[in-house]
């Protein structure tokens, strides 16, 4: 189930994104990026619709994924 990021409080959204970024440990290439930069990147992706927040009823968790990978 999709969760609209605008429905979350700013603090909750920030915490979800930080948790996602820390969990993913994504490689950003030659230049290391700060946590704040990574969070800003994910937030921008949510705001422009490239990424979505997804609630898993099975696992009772929230995940962030590219919109193109989301299937209901």
From Swiss-Prot:
Family matches, as InterPro entries: UPF0270, YehU-like_sf
- Lineage top rank: taxon: Bacteria
Q: Family assignment?
A: Belongs to the UPF0270 family.
Database matches in HAMAP family = UPF0270 (MF_00690)
Q: What is this protein called?
A: UPF0270 protein YheU
Q: Which organism is it from?
A: Shigella dysenteriae serotype 1 (strain Sd197)
Q: Which gene encodes it?
A: yheU
């Amino acid at each position: 189930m999709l969760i609209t990021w605008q429905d979350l409080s700013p603090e909750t959204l920030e915490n979800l994104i930080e948790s996602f970024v820390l969990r993913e440990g994504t490689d950003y290439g030659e230049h290391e990026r700060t946590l704040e930069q990574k969070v800003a990147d994910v937030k921008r992706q949510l705001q422009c619709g490239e990424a979505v927040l997804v609630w898993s009823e099975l696992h009772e968790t929230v995940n962030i994924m590219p919109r193109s990978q989301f299937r209901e």
